[in-house]
Regions:
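Hydrophobic/aromatic ligand-binding patch that stacks against planar heteroaromatic rings
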Residues: 132-133, 187, 207
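Short active-site oxyanion
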Residues: 192-196
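N-terminal Rossmann-like NAD(P)+-binding subdomain of aldehyde/semialdehyde dehydrogenases
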Residues: 1-105
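Conserved small/polar residues in nucleotide/adenosyl-binding loops
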Residues: 199-206
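A glycine-rich helix N-cap at a beta->alpha junction
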Residues: 169-175
Length: 209
């Protein structure tokens, strides 16, 4: 599928999570954490492939950020479980204005829609971003750096398994197959589909394909 196809598919899944109760969202998140640990071996195999391909092309600091082991995956799962423990502010009234004519105006905290996250080669961002997006009642579109793509794709596959096992729509989290600069541009310019885009890239990555 093209980047735009995946964006549309992700956006179409939004009603399933924006209307979900806090209990339903937390059940999905807990299942995501469990699935991440259950798929540890598959994720580590993909990470080893990414590490082999990246050696000699990125710095030792970046290699360390890319590297995963069981302890790091356990920490990622614990991060998702920590999100479960956070308060759910969806629907919270932030302010109220009462007019003399009886009309009441509320400032209310509501989900935004599709949150796109464009990031470099940090596998832990994949699970952190997905968890926080779902907790807030939004859907998540991820675009990983090319060095971490195999790892990120395996993590997303595990998260989607967890979502499905908890009765959620797996398309509330998706990853773009295209890691080129063009795909990042497409995402940032997808008006009407993307509510918010967050970009965290190394300086040189913004100008390379």
């Amino acid at each position: 599928m093209t980047t735009m196809d995946i964006l549309r598919r992700t956006k179409a899944a939004w009603p399933s999570i924006c209307n979900a109760s806090a209990e339903d969202k937390n059940r999905i998140l807990s299942a995501m954490a469990d699935s991440l640990q259950a798929e540890c071996d598959a994720i580590l195999r993909c990470n080893a492939e990414d590490m082999d391909a990246a050696r000699g092309h990125i710095s030792d600091v970046m290699l360390d950020r890319l590297y995963l082991d069981k302890d790091r995956i356990d920490a990622m799962a614990d991060g998702i479980r920590a999100t479960v423990a956070l308060p759910d502010h969806t629907g919270r009234i932030l302010a109220q204005i009462d007019h003399p004519n009886g009309m009441k105006i509320y400032k209310k905290q509501v989900p935004l829609g599709l949150v796109a996250i464009i990031y470099e080669s940090r596998p832990n961002v994949t699970s952190d971003a997905a968890a926080l997006t779902i907790k807030s009642g939004n859907v998540c579109m991820l675009r990983s750096g090319k060095e971490a793509f195999r790892t990120a794709k395996a993590i997303v596959a595990a998260l989607k398994q967890g979502i499905a096992s908890a009765g959620g729509d797996p398309d509330i989290v998706n990853i773009v197959e295209d890691t080129s600069h063009q795909s990042a541009t497409e995402i940032m310019q997808a008006k009407g589909l993307v509510a918010v885009s967050y970009t965290h890239l190394r300086a040189h990555e913004t100008s390379q394909d």
